[in-house]
Each structure stands twice: as structure tokens, then as C-alpha cells.
């Protein structure tokens, strides 16, 4: 197999993010995709490595390494990237004085057993805590005291001092890493501002927050007048296609009984909207009826007055005729 060239040319410039080692090929596929995918993958990988070797290089223990630049794509992740730790008090002092850390051997020769043993840890070499005899120094203030107990106490003091220094370093780092005030981090993911969300978007967000509990919202208490969850995540359960006739008949009877027992629901807004013009029409009819009633009453009184007038005239003419007749006789 002939060696292939390391020089790669692209008709359309790809998107390269060296911080994430990301390469996006924007050229469209032509022809059979399966045949060209392998060659395209090789060229894209070669072009990515060509860009990597253009960065600043340095040699560390017979290996060449490069420092990747900052990533341009912000990928979502569970936890944020670890920040550079604040140097401890000793590290600052060593840097100022030029003290370099020496690499110690992992094994040490034990003079007592004439063997190579670990420098630190279990069964380490030259372990003075295993001595059965301690030589009393010449300048000892009290030669009769317990030197074994004194050694144990000094070790406890050293451990406590190291722990105190470790806690101080952590507190010093916390002061520099803890941010105060509003967050200045960029939002991860594509979305809209909370103020621009619709009522339905807010509702979905509330439902998702309710389910984000250890029991998946099963024991979450609801507020008074709160609506039920829109998406419960439960699958619909359908009845069997083959069911006995008695069960279907009983279900139909239950529906009829429920329809009979329920009262008609009246929507106040619709009822007031419909009843408004009807009420006005009824009031107009009542006013008109009252006027007609008074008019009819006056007509009746007028008819009665005329009737009484006619009757009185008839009575008067009849009495005069009778008197004249009597005179003639």
C-alpha cells in the first residue's frame, strides 16, 4: 500500500475546534456514501492532526506534547471544568526561594534487616516506631520519663498541625474561587429568556420541576387550586377488543346514570351574555304591556261612562212619555 500524502485540501473550509478536538466537515456527500466515507474520515483526521502540530510544542520525558487552546464550543456537562487551584503557602514560599521538589526513591535500604523496603507506608524501611529500645540522650531533662509516649504525642501533634495547614489552604482557595453577586456565566443550550416564555412553556417547566424528585413527583404535595400535571408520563391503557356483552352493557348504564345525576353546567359569562339582551327585551315588553293595560282601562271607563249616559237619557225620555200619556187620558 502506497504512502498517502499528509497535505489535505478542502473545497469548503471545515469548522475546527482544537480545544474539544472537534472537526466538522461541511462538504456535501456525492455518489455512494459507503465508498467515500473511509477516505473522507482519513483526510479529516489528517487535517485535524496537521492543525494540532502547528501549536506550540515541548518535550517532557521523551514525549512531545502540545497545549490545546481554549474551546470555542461550550458543550453541556454535569459539572463545570476544574479551575486552577490557588497555590499553597509553602508552594508560594518555594517559588520565591527557588526551592525545587526533589523526586524521592520509592525504595530504601533498611540497615536493620538488610533489605530493600518501601520508603513510606506499610512495612516501610527504617521505621523508628518499631524500635523496642530508645537511647536516652545526654541532654535529657528527665531521664525517667516515658520516651515512647513522648514520641507518640509528637506524632499526634504533627498530624494535627498538617491537618490545620490543609484546612487553611482550603479556606484560602475558597475565598478566591467563590463568586459573589449575580452570575456572569453564559447560558448553555438553546432557549428563550424566562420573561419571554409563554404560559404553556412555564406550565411545562413547573411540571418538569415537580418530577425532579427522588420519588419522581409521586409524593409531591400540590397547592390549593393547582391544575394537574399536563404530561404525567403514564401510558394509556385501552380496554380489550374482546369484551363480554354484560360488561359493555354495564358501562353504558353507568354513563346514562352519570348523565342523569349531573346537573347542567352553566357558564356565568355565557349566561350573562345571553341573558343580557333577553332581559332588556323583557323589560321593554313589560313597559309596553303596562301602557296597554292603562290604555285599556281608560277605554273601559269611557265605555262605561257613555253607557251610563245613554241609559240615563233613555230613562229620562221614557218617564216624560208616560206623564204625557196620563194627561191625555
Swiss-Prot record:
UniProt xrefs under Pfam families: RRS1 (PF04939)
Compositional bias segments (type: Basic residues): 320-329
Annotated InterPro entries: Ribosom_reg
Ranges of compositional bias, category Basic and acidic residues: 278-295
Keyword ATP-binding in annotation: no
Localization of this protein: Nucleus, Nucleolus
Cellular component, GO annotation: nucleolus; preribosome, large subunit precursor
Family per similarity comment: Belongs to the RRS1 family.
Name of the protein in its database record: Ribosome biogenesis regulatory protein homolog
Originating organism: Caenorhabditis briggsae
Underlying gene: rrbs-1
